């Protein structure tokens, strides 16, 4: 379990690009390039490694002012002995006076067969112009898991457009018609509410001891559905060339 970190979790006014997170046992990292996501997205990939009981993160991009940073480890952190994952662990700090804590979540399905889409980047744009998806990197970002599920954390109050992108060149914007994409016409307005749920305490592995109601914070929307499809490659290319005369030729394009 988590012991301490530098900076502290949810620290504000942090200007240090190096983060150290310590746990109570030796750990290792698995598939960081596939599982770990930093938000806002980093154009220069961060250096993330395990060292004994610590995870060390070095952010290469310059820190943006008054911005909440979230490092979502998913299940990349595992104990060194048995390989048990520390599931859904994330770490946040802010470069400003306050830290943003809103979240949205949902599922990406393939439009053709409604199967879950794994490994798709899902991001938010505060710029509501439809062209922002092709011109600007995401403002906040996450990645779908094997069930197609995603959670985008560290969101400020406001209105957003949401998009999915199978980002082959890792620039967090739609600049290739061959990339699989997903989007919603609806404007996303993150919010939260107090909610209750049933929690079970077990006497042993087969006997329920107590069922109690516990309070928690529910982040909304938590049921976004995005349908992914591959864009149509409408780029022109030379399909045929003819030269019927010495001083005359014909070029045909798609």
Residue spans of the language-model regions?
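Acidic carboxylate motifs that coordinate Ca2+ or other divalent cations, activating on Asp/Glu
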Residues: 171
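Acidic, low-complexity Ser/Thr/Gly/Pro-rich repeat segments typical of extracellular/periplasmic
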Residues: 1-147, 151-154, 159-168, 177-192, ...
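Short beta-rich binding modules
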Residues: 197-199
């Amino acid at each position: 379990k988590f012991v301490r970190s530098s900076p502290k979790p949810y620290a504000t006014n942090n200007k240090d690009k190096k983060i150290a997170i310590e746990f109570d046992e030796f750990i290792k990292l698995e598939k960081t390039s596939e599982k770990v996501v930093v938000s806002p997205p980093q154009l220069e990939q961060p250096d993330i490694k395990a060292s004994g009981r610590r995870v060390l993160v070095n952010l290469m991009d310059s820190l943006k002012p008054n911005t909440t940073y979230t490092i979502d480890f998913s299940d990349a952190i595992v104990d060194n002995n048995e390989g048990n994952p520390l599931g859904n662990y994330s770490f946040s700090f802010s470069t400003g006076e306050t830290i943003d804590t809103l979240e949205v979540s949902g599922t990406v399905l393939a439009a053709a067969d409604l199967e879950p889409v794994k490994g798709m980047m899902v991001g938010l744009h505060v710029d509501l112009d439809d062209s922002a998806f092709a011109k600007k990197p995401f403002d906040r970002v996450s990645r779908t898991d094997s069930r197609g599920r995603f959670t985008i954390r560290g969101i400020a109050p406001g209105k957003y457009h949401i998009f999915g992108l199978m980002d082959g060149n890792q620039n967090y914007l739609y600049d290739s018609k061959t990339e699989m994409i997903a989007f919603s016409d609806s404007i996303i307005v993150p919010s939260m509410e107090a909610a209750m749920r049933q929690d079970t305490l077990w006497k042993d592995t087969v006997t329920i001891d107590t069922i109690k109601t516990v309070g928690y914070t529910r982040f909304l929307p938590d049921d976004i559905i995005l349908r992914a499809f591959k864009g149509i490659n409408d780029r022109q290319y030379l399909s045929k060339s003819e030269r019927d005369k010495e001083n005359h030729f014909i070029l045909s394009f798609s």
